[in-house]
Amino acid sequence: MKIEIGTIFPSHFKSSYPEEFELFSHFETTSGIPTAFFAVMGGLYQHTHTYANIQREACFGINFLPVSCYDRLINTIRGNEYEADEFQAGGFTVQDAKTIHAPMIQEAFINMECTLKDIQDLSGAGITAMVIGQVQHISVDEEYAQGYEKRYGKDGFMMLIPAPQDLKTGEPAQSAVATVNIERLD
């Protein structure tokens, strides 16, 4: 089951300090992601059908999956022809969004529903773009709804680390997939 949070401030949310929710969106504490009022995807390739879909539909979903789903995500890239069903290629379940008309991944521990705010050509040459969406709704899996344990660590947020170049030899390294760990509380 997922906990649903929309644009209306949840009355049961308590602030950590005075003015917290006057200064920051409640979406930041809902998702555990800084500035989650807006979702920014940098470096989205403009030749992809994802980019075309976002431009056409003026909305998009962001689905956060644990690193254990990485191989399934890679299957969606390998089966990425225009007519292909990427959900089926990855073995994911399609879930209807609450506020937009883009499909969501049911297995995601956090789903963010966004309306398109802006697109900027980062490359200046039609190669990559920064896509900015305004968050309309966030769904959080109940297991991830409390504390840090599930969101941060092996079952939480993951990110692709581009292959670093060896700065002495010039040799390329292999890309990596990382998870986020809490090192200390502030």
Set out the residue ranges of the language-model regions.
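Basic, polyanion-binding surface patches
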Residues: 1-186
